[in-house]
Amino acid sequence: MINFFDHINPEGKANIPSKKKPMFPIKEDLRQYLKRYGREVLLPFSYQDLQRFTYTIPLKDKNGKDTAWEQVSYDMREWDFLRKSLVKVYAILKTEGDLSFANHLDVARIDYCYFGNSQPFRIRIVNKFNDNYDHYYIKKADASRIYGLELEHILSPNRITYFTSKDTLIEEHIPGIPGDLFIRDYISAANTNKIRLAKEFVKFNERCFVQLLGDMRSYNFVVNIIPDIEDFQYRIRAIDFDQQSYEGRKNLYLPQFFKDNQALVNMVLKHLDKQSIEQYQAEEKTMMTFRLVSSRYRVKELLDIMDDDQISTDEKITELREALFVHFNNPQYLKAITMGQLLKTHLKCSLRKYLKKMPKTGKHE
């Protein structure tokens, strides 16, 4: 179990990921996996086509403050080509490519983010009849991010729609209140159920560690507030999967150790006792185990592909291997020589207790 009461970073280092993670190419067997599960499609354009903008305008938030986004503009010929293609992509995301609704859809805006490894474009699609809009993202395809998206889709309570086309990645927009804004504007509100929020942060912390999903600083997750009988429930969702099984420091896979999340950690320590924290950790691992068993063949296929994929450096693999060995006191970690092997061992060690309790027959078989 992860100890929330030991929330000070024992490694003596600032809990900050590497400033620049390299982009790892999608190897052929991962590409075949994506095709088998309907994740690879043929697009009429690529990420590189979107880079041919002519100028940008900085975007500000509703309070007039600068954001990391810029609105981009294209020459007329380029814009006409992109508009049709981007509406088609939206149809693929939402209606399996049914273009019968495309006539009342249009591209309202394209934004570019210069911050982050994937340098995403955010596409705003608008319904011309009622002005309702939606977003999706176009990024550089990266093997780390693909593994993170797949693991989140399979092991977490959240389904994710995305697809690839060669070196281009299309991701749906994950709605919610950005974590940093939630901490700033909502966490102290009188109607915030702090016990339920603390419970969800414990579960989110556990999911990230079991999946080895790193860098969950507050701007890399969103919070959903769900009305429930007489109160609210909360769901914290990761929105950035760039740091899947890349970093060497164990605490980078634990949201509780990021300074940005200190207010959530304090809430856990104030409202939950040790037994309650352990209960919620066990609940989350049990549900992850159900999902793992239900999708065991797909998970095995993915982990076998990840097994020999080079998605980190030898130094980081060695550092994480040693840290997990010390944490679990399990020599099985010392046999791993890739991040994929480490993750496979980590899933077994984290969920073995719960796997033993799974029924051998029935709906989970």
Features from the language model and the residues they span:
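A general structural signal for short secondary-structure junctions and capping/turn motifs
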Residues: 7-16, 23, 113, 128-129, ...
